[in-house]
Structure formats: structure tokens, C-alpha cells
Amino acid sequence: EITKAHETAILGQLDAPAPENTGDTAPGTARDAGDSAARAYAARYVHAFGAEALSGLRIGVYQHSSVARDIMADVVTALGGTALPLARSETFIPVDTEAVDPATRDQLAAWCRDHRLDALISTDGDADRPMVTDATGRIVPGDVLGPLTARMLGAHEVCTPVSSNTM
């Protein structure tokens, strides 16, 4: 979390001139480092699950304004699936993956139906809370998704918050 001092410093930069963008992608530049990190991130999933793990599957990627919107599609593709980006936004869209409103649930189901998706994935804005649906657009709750992930990873014990109530 940021402190009030951090917030003040951030706000102080709002009126500062933007640095010149040279478009330089030479080795060692920030963009090159970001591309390298993205490739390494996707490779980690390929190493864990194999390059054909999602072969033949159509996965919707509800992108909205999530910071993970591009990397999610990249990982699906790296795992052999077909990623279908949906609803990308350049303005902030608040998404609470644990309290999805009825209109959004209806939209998720419509995308799954209309695009013949096998699943749909997303995250909240800062990508620390995933969202997964089945082929009908029904959301797999986080307190179910966590133990499923733990099982896949071979965990023998799982601790969940007291608010985990759909298990």
C-alpha cells in the first residue's frame, strides 16, 4: 500500500512534463526489460503445464482495464489455446472478482455462448484477484478456485479465510 507521503509525491508529478519517448527498444531499455519479463512469465506457465495444455480450447479474456490484460492472452496462446480478447478499455473499469454484479454475469454468459468459449478469464484491475468462468459463463468463486489450484499444485493442506463459504 502507498502512504500519504507517497500519494503526495505521485500527485506532485501530475503537472510535470512527460519524458521524451524515443521508442528505443534496444537491449537494456525499459521496454526491452518488460518484453523480456513477459516472455519469462509466459515461459514459466509453459514449463509447468506444457505448450499444448490449452490446445483446442477457446478462452475468452475479459481485458477491461486490468494491468494483466495482455499477459493473460499471451499465456493462453503460449499454452496452445486460442485467446479471444474481450471488452478492452483505456479507462478504469472497477472489477470486483468476488462480487460480480448481475449485469456483468449476464455479459460473461453471453460472451461464452456467442463466442463458443470453453472458459473465460480475467482479473481485478491490479491483477491480484483472478476470475475464471466455465463454458456457460458461470464464475468459479475464489474460495473454490484457491483449493482447486492448491490441489493442482499438490498441496496437502489449505488454509482459507473464515469468509470462504462456497466450499
Please annotate each region the language model reported.
Residues 1, 72-73, 129-146:
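Short Gly/Thr/Asp-enriched flexible loops that form oxyanion-binding sites at enzyme active sites
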Residues 1-113:
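Gly/Ser/Thr-enriched, mixed-charge loops and adjacent short helices
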Residues 16-36, 136-167:
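Proline/glycine-rich low-complexity loops and linkers
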Residues 49-54, 111-115, 123-124, 131-133, ...:
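Solvent-exposed alpha-helices and their adjacent loops that cap or buttress functional pockets
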Residues 63, 124, 162:
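Conserved residues at beta->alpha junctions
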Residues 68-69, 128-130, 166-167:
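Flexible loop/turn segments at secondary-structure boundaries
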Residues 118-122, 158-159:
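Short glycine-aspartate micro-motif
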